[in-house]
């Protein structure tokens, strides 16, 4: 937003006093255009300022007249414009001073109201300052040229005309001294313009580094290249004027000017060699990567040489990089830190692209030589860099030029499990390093507010969302990293966080650092939850204790989504339920990882759970998550198959009360389907009894009431609430030779019925509370189990229990054929008859 965009939003009474010397309605017509002109940089009264002020007055009148025509204003305003033109025509610098005063007042008012000026305004002012300085330099060079020609003519008439062409020095100064002084002043202005360019290059480098953390970055180097080339043109013109002045300058003055100009050129040339495409800042050995450099003055100096110079890429340590930064230092040294393959590329001009660059497409770090580390520093805290270097000769004198550019610091890893900690090192360095630092020095402690900005920037960039973190999120993060449960934002406002707290110290009661946990959240959200976060469906960064305070007074079924505090890369659902005593309770469902959500999405999981009703505070879940539900396929697919799906259920830690049920008068048999129209026979012979338990004090007499074709049916009396299946599942047979499910009596394989989400019940069997397994268990009787390779016994029934079951089976079978089976009595747990014969009952499914 522009400065005027903020001023126009302010109450009129706060800015009305600024428009005493200039009508306020005309200021409205000028709008943003006014702040796009160099009013603040015309502070002199020389010929350059006067000429530019006259041009600005004409532009102002034209802009006002055009604005009046567009808005259909009346002749009254046109009359004001005409009056304005006539007033300032005699002294255009007065108009410059008036507008400068208005803009300064507007900036002050905006600072008081909004505490900051808009960033586009800063960039616009910086651009205006450089362009105005460049125009002044061009004007100065023109004055120098006129003065030098006048001096060389050596006529009195020439000296008289000189006063009308240029600003003459103080009284008593001759033309030669005036030329020398003008050259020195212009060289000083060139040095100031060079400083602006170098500062702008440093800002570009810093922005490039911050872009590694996700900051926006205008990476085009074309504006910077244009600035550098324009300064080189000014340098060339000044150098020609110094050389052409000849005897008009003293040798000492000429040598001083030549040295200053050469230093300007040297600094520009060496500063214009930049790493345009940075190598990966977390670099794995034996992995190909790319990088690129650009020489902003290549089109000016390299031309079309027969053999373009080669750019070489080498790995350097932090110590070697520090030596490179020292003027006239020893350089990087001969010792190699790492071997890079395919590390030379020619530096070539591209006329269509208007640039001079070298792109390394197939770099590969073959190996790395670790240097000595400081104290407890790990290998993922060791920073290196890639040094790009090239050399060529400049000008007719074949002046040797050495170009060097250092990449951003990078961390070399040899295994993927080092990636997380390496990213922490790079994040910290990118965020908190200073411009023009000694490589690669960075603060050990930083203000928590800066850390919040960094985490927010990284989160938005990594996830790919425009929804950043909220103040409540930062409060939770502060509590986590400082191990402080303060509930006030002000408690953390002036605190600082250390590198150790960020990624060296293990969080209290956990097995990971703060960054490792936060990076897990980043990865999970990026891979599975971007749309949910962007739709503000996830609170995310909130403690379990705060969740309880939010949900405890909400209706049953109210839920919210939060990132797991105890696991890396997990999200959990917290919801309100009623306990057995009727009091509200908060349950947190086991966290879902990225792998879990790749199997079934978060939205579909929420749809599966009927107990979830409203997203906190009061938004119906179907309204909130409908766009995230996967459409259900109806009918058969293209191959003729009926679609199957996986659905999620949740185990209750305390099962609901079970109504008292009655044992049926008949126990049905379960046909395995191994042979048509037949059932598995089971003879209880002495030779089939497993010797697992010591012999009972008494034994069961052999039972001969069943023929080999008849079945003995044994009811499972154990309830397994974790075996919960949705009602849409099909059937499958359980092989007879599989081990018996844990917690069930050995019996013939049967088709079990499950009512989800509650304990397992057979579809056509009701249960009594006093089952055979609720009786005291004594020694295991002989002659009971049919074979130890079929279903190994868990809890041995008594002789009385077995006899009762066998007699019931005999009496109800009707001499070998089962009679009519009773209907299933109503169950508290939901629908009955959901067959799970196709499921492995030994498993503990989560769906």
Swiss-Prot record:
Residue list for modification Phosphotyrosine: 641
Assembly: Forms a homodimer or a heterodimer with a related family member. Interacts with NCOA1 via its C-terminal LXXLL motif.
Phenotypic consequence of residue 382 to Q: In HIES6; likely pathogenic; gain of function in interleukin-4-mediated signaling pathway; increased DNA-binding transcription factor activity; increased STAT6 phosphorylation at baseline and after stimulation with IL4
Gene Ontology CC terms, in alphabetical order: chromatin; cytoplasm; cytosol; nucleoplasm; nucleus; RNA polymerase II transcription regulator complex
Main location: cytoplasm
Protein name: Signal transducer and activator of transcription 6
Modified residue annotations for N-acetylserine: 2
Species name: Homo sapiens (Human)
